[in-house]
Structures are given as structure tokens and as C-alpha cells.
Amino acid sequence: MEKKAKKKEQRYLMFLLSILLSSCSIIGLTNDFGKLTPTEKNKIISLKKFEKLSQDTIYKINASQLKQELLKYESAMVYEFTNGCSSEYCRPLQVYENYAQKHHYKLFLVMNGFGNLDKTKSQTVTSPLFAIDGDYYKKCFRSVYTRYFDNELRDKPLKDKDWLGGIFIFEHGKYVKTLQDLPKE
């Protein structure tokens, strides 16, 4: 009789646990596109070309497209970031815009997913917003397609696992260095 009661209790606990877990929402495992509202989804499109970019749109991009565009600029800075990041290395986007302007960099702001999109959209920036196109890399996990994007930017094998930072500096389209944080001034 005791075994039957214990089994029933275990089933009940499993049932409660499954209800609890089904109501959880994990942000950042994938690109989180499915968690966006229909209105937000409509404002995200694949980049066709770098002309007439709207402040109201987020453009999905891959590193190959970006590298082609980087060739047009003497100096460029790519900041690949996570929306709503609270790390010591994450600053408001305006800080990156100010730094790029002061140092004559063309700035490209590239999100690595769509979770916490409201935290980015609530900031005032003049630069267009881009997002890594995970579908291009045929990977659904954010950590994987972000690594592939970063490595392709640096002309490294896609599967290399060394993370050096999210700020990429280019001169005449050639990768120069990666930074974790903006230099102190």
C-alpha cells in the first residue's frame, strides 16, 4: 500500500513540475524570434542592401554581407551585443555611437538575438539596428550562430571557440582587433 501512495505522490509531483516548467520562458537559448509580438516580427526583415535603412526596422544580416559593406569605410566598428545585457562590458548604445563618432568609425550595431528587444528599442540611437541571421548559419542556438558570425567576421574557422569580445575594429574592410570593452579615455 505504501508503494502505491509513493508512486501516486511522485506522479503528482511530476505533474506539478511539468505545469511549472511549461509556464517558464527561457530567453537567450535561441534567437527568441518566436517570443515577439506580430508587430515586432513585422519590423524585422532580411537585409537586401545597405541603402535607405530605416530607424524603425531591424535588419537580419550575416557576416559575409557585413564584410562586403565594411570594405567601403576607412575605419569601422562592429558592436555585437545582447539586448538587455547587464554585464560590466555592456553599455548603453549611445556610448558606442559617441565613441565611434569621436574616433571616426562607421558603426554597425548588431544584436545576437531578439530577447529583451524592448530594452534596445527604448534607447535613442541614430545608427540602424542589425541582428545576426541565425538561419543563414543553419543553427538555432544563439551561442553557436553568434560564434559563427564572430568567427566569419575575423576570417577564422567557424567552429573556433575563442571569444575575445563583442567589439570588432576594421580598417579598409580588414579585421584589426577585437575588444571586450571600449578603451578608457
Language-model region placement:
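Bacterial N-terminal signal peptides that target proteins for export
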Residues: 2-13
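Bacterial N-terminal signal peptides
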Residues: 13-23
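Bacterial signal peptide processing site
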Residues: 25-28
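Post-signal peptide N-terminal segment of mature Sec-exported envelope proteins
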Residues: 34-54
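Structural microenvironment flanking redox-active thiols in thiol-disulfide oxidoreductases
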Residues: 89-130
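A short, hydrophobic beta-strand/beta-hairpin element that forms part of a small beta-sheet core
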Residues: 163-178
